[in-house]
A protein has these predicted regions:
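Alpha-helical transmembrane segments and their helix-start/interface "positive-inside/aromatic belt" motifs
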Residues: 1, 9-23, 94-112, 116, ...
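Binding/recognition "hotspot" determinant
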Residues: 1-72
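Non-cytosolic segments of integral membrane proteins
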Residues: 24, 107-203, 237, 241-286
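Internal transmembrane helix-loop-helix hairpins in multi-pass membrane proteins, together
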Residues: 33-65, 85, 89, 109, ...
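Hydrophobic, aromatic-rich alpha-helical transmembrane segments
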Residues: 60-64, 95-99, 103, 165, ...
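Juxtamembrane "helix exit" motif at the C-terminal ends of alpha-helical transmembrane segments
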Residues: 70, 74-86, 237-252
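Hydrophobic transmembrane alpha-helix segments characteristic of membrane transport
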Residues: 72-108, 203-217
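Alpha-helical transmembrane segments
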Residues: 208-225, 252-254, 283-287
Length: 289
């Protein structure tokens, strides 16, 4: 009877060890895939991310928002001219330099507004260049090679009792579930950020029409800061995932397998929190409201 029980126990241990190793191997592989996937998603320009949505947004901006921006530009320029005349004692104290300055500012605004789309895309091209360079370094430095540690981990598991192995199996399954939750979190952040970019760029001509005005110019300046914040939010996301992947490397050298699994769980929750904070942090850095 003891012989039969030993065989069943040995079979269950082998089954649990194989399942635990499979879960942990998939866990490490998922980290590597997520780093590469985030680099592709957040590092893409609006045009490269989805050409169909990009074309629709540009068409709406050129045909609906741009005429409104032209009206706003004319209104802002007229109000500035009236204010300048009033401030100069109804032109009694006005010199040609002031008038030339107004003409120059208005001409600059007339040039900027029709080329708003090119200016906006240039901002994201700069951000994409930065993210591409950073993601290359991140993927190279945080790729976790499970082949180098799997033998030692199997030896540790083989020394454990059946009950402890079952507990580890449950824990590894739970941590694997959190990785799926993390994937959903990353999906929401990356796709939500791109949709926000499309929404912001669709109305770009309106704030850009106010850039040349002294009083209304804050609207355009804050809009540009918001664009840079959205662009460089991708860089912060890359850094968050890179830090996470480096921290997860500790599971390969942790003596206590259970502690390693729960540490990985804690890092996953921390990553979700920091990813959601990247938007407010980027806006704070660029002082965008």
């Amino acid at each position: 009877m003891n012989f039969l029980w030993d065989k069943v126990t040995e079979w269950l241990k082998e089954l649990l060890i194989g399942s635990i190793m499979s879960n942990l191997t998939g866990l490490f592989d998922n980290v590597n895939r997520q780093v590469a996937g985030i680099a592709d998603n957040v590092g893409a320009t609006p045009q490269a991310w989805n050409g169909g949505v990009f074309g629709m947004i540009r068409n709406l901006s050129d045909n609906v928002i741009l005429p409104i921006a032209g009206v706003i530009l004319a209104l802002v320029a007229t109000l500035e001219l009236i204010q300048m005349i009033v401030d100069r004692n109804n032109m009694h104290d006005m010199d040609t330099f002031m008038l030339a300055k107004w003409v120059f500012k208005t001409a600059c605004a007339v040039v900027i507004v029709p080329n708003t789309w090119n200016i906006v895309m240039a901002v994201f091209d700069v951000a994409q260049s930065v993210v591409s360079r950073a993601s290359g370094l991140v993927i190279a430095d945080t790729d976790i090679r499970i082949d180098s540690v799997i033998v030692g981990l199997e030896a540790k598991l083989a020394e454990m009792e059946l009950g402890a192995l079952f507990g580890l199996w449950v824990q590894s399954m739970f941590v694997g579930f959190t990785m799926w939750a993390l994937a959903i979190c990353i999906f929401i952040i990356t796709y939500g950020r791109m949709i926000e970019i499309y929404l912001v760029t669709s109305v770009a001509p309106i704030p850009m029409a106010t850039m040349a005005n002294r009083e209304w110019g804050q609207m355009g300046q804050n809009y540009l800061r918001s664009l840079f914040a959205l662009g460089f939010q991708a860089f912060l996301i890359i850094i968050c995932v890179a830090i996470y992947a480096v921290l997860v490397r500790g599971i390969a050298v942790e003596n206590d397998v259970s502690t390693a699994i729960w540490t990985c769980m804690g890092y996953t929750v921390l990553l979700c929190f920091t990813l959601f904070k990247t938007s407010s942090l980027a806006r704070s850095v660029f002082h965008a409201h």
